[in-house]
Curated annotation (Swiss-Prot):
Protein location: Cytoplasm
Name listed for the protein in its UniProt record: Holo-[acyl-carrier-protein] synthase
Cofactor requirements of the protein: Mg(2+)
Pfam family, one: ACPS
Record bears the keyword Secreted: no
GO CC terms in record: cytoplasm
Role, per record: Transfers the 4'-phosphopantetheine moiety from coenzyme A to a Ser of acyl-carrier-protein.
Keywords: Cytoplasm, Fatty acid biosynthesis, Fatty acid metabolism, Lipid biosynthesis, Lipid metabolism, Magnesium, Metal-binding, Transferase
Entry similarity comment: Belongs to the P-Pant transferase superfamily. AcpS family.
Swiss-Prot/TrEMBL catalytic activity: apo-[ACP] + CoA = holo-[ACP] + adenosine 3',5'-bisphosphate + H(+)
Originating organism: Klebsiella pneumoniae (strain 342)
Origin organism lineage: Bacteria, Pseudomonadati, Pseudomonadota, Gammaproteobacteria, Enterobacterales
GO biological process: fatty acid biosynthetic process
Primary enzyme class: transferase
Amino acid sequence: MAILGLGTDIVEIARIEAVIARSGDRLARRVLSDHEWSIWEQHQQPVRFLAKRFAVKEAAAKALGTGIRNGLAFNQFEVYNDELGKPKLRLWGEAKLLAERMGVRAIHVTLADERHYACATVIVES
């Protein structure tokens, strides 16, 4: 196994909160997959949930070497938790095709949040 890419992102939670206050759920609709959306709608801390997903998806796009552009969209990345609560990532559409072309065999995700910030790191391996 070799590291093919590494991405990290930090999000100011108040910034996400301000966007939601200004434009309602538009950002959440753009960022979240259908499954994540269903969780977000019922989450006790929806702003924090969205900030963490945003950070993971930005970090993942950076790890793939492109960022969110060139056909990649936030909803092509889906964050979920395994049975122990560890964050994992599913890829769809162009993100999945790009990962396959790169030879990605494993994706590692870590995320953390504190009062003001959410931070994520994603490593893609062959």
